[in-house]
Swiss-Prot record:
Classification of source organism: Bacteria, Pseudomonadati, Pseudomonadota, Gammaproteobacteria, Pasteurellales
Gene name, Swiss-Prot/TrEMBL: rplB
SUPFAM superfamilies, per the entry: Nucleic acid-binding proteins, Translation proteins SH3-like domain
Superkingdom of the source species: Bacteria
GO biological process, one term: cytoplasmic translation
Family: Belongs to the universal ribosomal protein uL2 family.
Protein name according to UniProt: Large ribosomal subunit protein uL2
Length: 273
């Protein structure tokens, strides 16, 4: 994997930094594992904007990823690594011994030809998936379930991982990248290793148009608006003279946004500042 800084042949190329991975498959994706992906433009079924700054962008096919890893005790071989436009991580196409193919998240260190397996008796090896009850304390894992059988929900983006720091009764304690420590049922399944493509954070888009390709529209500052459009709007200067708020008047600096009190008891320590 190489980090390439583009030559300043134009204003739009001057600051571009690309991540080039020669190991990625250059052909088309595996068609049976593709699905349609329709654009919403940030609108709901009423046609009202529910998420701002979304619209346009290149068309994409959704890749059906196996987050559950529920094909147990059947070895699989990595056929190829692929780019996925729907996530920051790369994905791997694996061929199971019974002939079925699936996409999985590509962990760091996984190469074409490697053998992986899911199941309670799988060895502790990068890419293998098994219940956290059977994973040694101190191990680094990704694609971690919050509920048994629901599929991985934690640590799925590029470079993400979680560390198992304790096992007590029916629960294991995890340390997340944010610094949060939380308990999860030991029967939940996780995959050994960390997600690959950790250099993703080093890329620089270099121009506004690159964000438009991704379907992200411009974000206008509230202080640049009129009073009718935003609480920060209006006035003769740039100072809006109040605590920062959203367009709907809700505090925006440090206000807690978590509402699921039912699972608060599983959080041992809140994330660090």
């Amino acid at each position: 994997m190489a980090i390439v800084k583009c030559k300043p042949t134009s204003a739009g190329r001057r600051h571009v930094v690309k991540i080039v991975n020669p190991e990625l498959h250059k052909g088309k994706p595996y068609a049976p594992l593709l699905d349609t992906k329709s654009k919403t433009g940030g609108r709901n079924n009423y046609g009202r904007i529910t998420t701002r700054h979304i619209g346009g962008g290149h068309k994409q096919h959704y890749r059906l990823i196996d987050f559950k890893r529920n094909k147990l005790d059947i070895p699989a071989v990595v056929e190829r690594l692929e780019y996925d436009p729907n996530r920051s991580a790369n994905i791997a196409l694996v061929l199971y011994k019974d002939g079925e193919r699936r996409y999985i998240l590509a962990p760091k260190g996984l190469s074409v030809g490697d053998q992986i397996q899911a199941g309670i008796n799988s060895p502790i090896k990068v890419g293998n998936s098994l219940p956290m009850r059977n994973i040694p304390v101190g191990s680094t894992v990704h694609n971690v379930e919050l509920k048994p059988g629901k599929g991985g929900q934690i640590a799925r983006s590029a470079g993400a991982y979680v560390q198992i720091i304790a096992r007590e009764g029916n629960y294991v304690t995890l340390r997340l990248r944010s610094g949060e420590m939380r308990k999860v049922l030991a029967e939940c399944v996780a995959t050994i290793g960390e997600v690959g493509n950790s250099e993703h954070m080093l890329r620089v888009l270099g121009k506004a148009g690159a964000n438009r390709w991704r379907g992200i529209r411009p974000t206008v500052r509230g202080t640049a608006m009129n009073p009718v459009d935003h609480p920060h709007g209006g006035g003769e200067g740039r100072n809006f003279g109040k605590h920062p708020v959203t367009p709907w008047g809700v505090q925006t600096k440090g206000k807690k946004t978590r509402h699921n009190k039912r699972t608060d008891k599983y959080i041992v320590r809140r994330r660090g500042k």
